[in-house]
Design a protein with these regions (language model features):
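Transmembrane helix-bundle signature of multi-pass membrane transporters/permeases
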Residues: 14-18, 48, 60, 79-87, ...
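Pore- and pathway-forming membrane helices of multi-pass small-molecule/ion transporters and channels
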Residues: 1, 52-106, 131-137
């Protein structure tokens, strides 16, 4: 738990991953000319306990699968795909649209959201990342894969 080199390497990897996903989502939304947001995107702009619960459940499944040889390690990848990638993609879309976005809510629209979409979805990403990290730490400690020494 105190391996500074591994922590730095992990932080750099996560940072590059975040930049890659946000950058790719921005380029694709710019290239496709996205001009309005549907409920799937706006739903990822305000974190709630259900989102955190999904991230924690995915973390339990993913980290537990890594402690068992008979279980596939791809479950950990599914945890990332479910909890981390969607909010990062929404952040990229929000950054591309900037203050010119229009969100569609049912029959009405709301214009001029500035970057609330990007900020809210990035907050969801951070909450999910922290939830996955802490939950995985607990699962690994319960499975005796480390100590506080």
């Amino acid at each position: 738990m105190s391996d500074g080199r591994l922590i730095r390497r992990s932080a750099v990897t996560v940072g590059f991953g975040v930049l890659a996903v946000v950058g790719t989502a921005s380029l694709i939304s710019w290239g496709l000319g996205v001009s309005y947001l549907q409920s799937e995107i706006t739903g990822r702009t305000s974190p709630n306990l259900i989102d955190l619960g999904i991230a924690i459940a995915a973390a339990v499944a993913g980290s537990f699968s890594m402690t068992r040889k008979q279980l596939s390690n791809s479950i950990a990848g599914v945890a990332i795909a479910v909890a981390l990638v969607p909010p990062l993609c929404v952040s990229g879309i929000g950054l591309t649209l900037g203050s010119e976005m229009v969100a569609v809510f049912g029959r009405g629209t709301v214009a001029g959201l500035t970057n609330q979409i990007a900020e809210g979805s990035f907050l969801l990403f951070l909450a999910n990342l922290i939830g996955i990290t802490v939950t995985s730490l607990v699962v690994f400690l319960v499975q005796r894969y480390g100590s506080f020494r």
